[in-house]
Amino acid sequence: MTAAIIGISLGLLIILIFSIFKHFDKKIIYGLILSGIGFLYVGFAWTDLLAVVINSIQAVLFFLMAYYGIKKNIHFLIAGYFLHGLWDISYHFFQNSNLIPPNYDLFCISIDFIFGFYLLLLVYRYKNMFQA
């Protein structure tokens, strides 16, 4: 439970920081975060070849979702965060799921869903702000 509280708190803190500094492009910031979190799993799994391959594939997929979210449509970013949350949930069904740190899944799910809902809120609140 502590991991989820830390994840929610950190997610809200990041949102607050980038809301204060309005000159940052939100699509780029949240796209960079999405692309980075996919590659964290590759770092966790480097000791197992099959896990590295699986995690590299998911990292590239989330990188592409981030890219298309920045360049084409923010809905790719929103979908990417929710899908990454589902990835966090499903990761325990893979062999060698113990390669990720304890409670990292709860921490990451919390941040993923906070960012996903925040971006969804922004899209529907400021429809013209996120046109490609």
Predicted regions and their residues:
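Hydrophobic cores of alpha-helical transmembrane segments in multi-pass inner/ER membrane proteins
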Residues: 10-13, 61-64, 110-122
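Membrane-interface helix-boundary motifs at transmembrane edges
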Residues: 18-30, 70-71, 128-132
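Structural signature of hydrophobic alpha-helical transmembrane segments
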Residues: 1-10, 49-57, 106
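Hydrophobic, membrane-inserted alpha-helices
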Residues: 12-15, 35-42, 57-65
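Membrane-helix boundary connector in multi-pass membrane proteins
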Residues: 77-79, 89-104
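N-terminal signal-anchor/start-transfer transmembrane helix
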Residues: 6-23
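Cytoplasmic-side transmembrane-helix entry/capping segments in multi-pass membrane proteins
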Residues: 27-36, 54-58, 77-83
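Membrane-interface helix caps and helix-loop-helix hairpins in membrane proteins
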Residues: 21-26, 44-52, 95-102
